[in-house]
Regions:
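Amphipathic, interaction-prone secondary-structure segments
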Residues: 2-27
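Residue-level preference for alpha-helix termini and adjacent loops
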Residues: 3-6, 31, 35-37, 56
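A short, structured beta-strand/loop element
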Residues: 19-45
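Mixed-charge, Lys/Arg-enriched low-complexity segments
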Residues: 42-81
């Protein structure tokens, strides 16, 4: 796996990788991470992958981090942990 770029964002760490014919977009926030795989056949360049990271996509991903935290918290509560 080859790291192509760190993409600055104020709320999450975003890293772009190339691996096995795919671009991997990795978003990290606290203890959570999301990885999106984009086939190199679906885009023409790394710039196209960066274009996918528009305001709507990032807003949805950040909301998903909140949902992930809520899900984990609820699981801890259900099991009295």
């Amino acid at each position: 796996m080859r790291q192509l770029a760190d993409i600055p964002h104020p709320e999450a760490k975003i890293t772009l990788f190339s691996w096995n014919g795919k671009y991997l977009i990795k978003l990290e926030k606290g203890p959570f991470e999301q990885t999106y795989k984009v086939s190199e056949m679906d885009v023409t360049s790394e710039a196209d992958v960066r274009d996918l990271l528009d305001e709507a996509f990032l807003a949805a991903a950040l909301a998903r981090f909140q949902a992930m935290a809520a899900d984990l918290h609820a699981a801890f509560q259900r099991h009295d942990l």
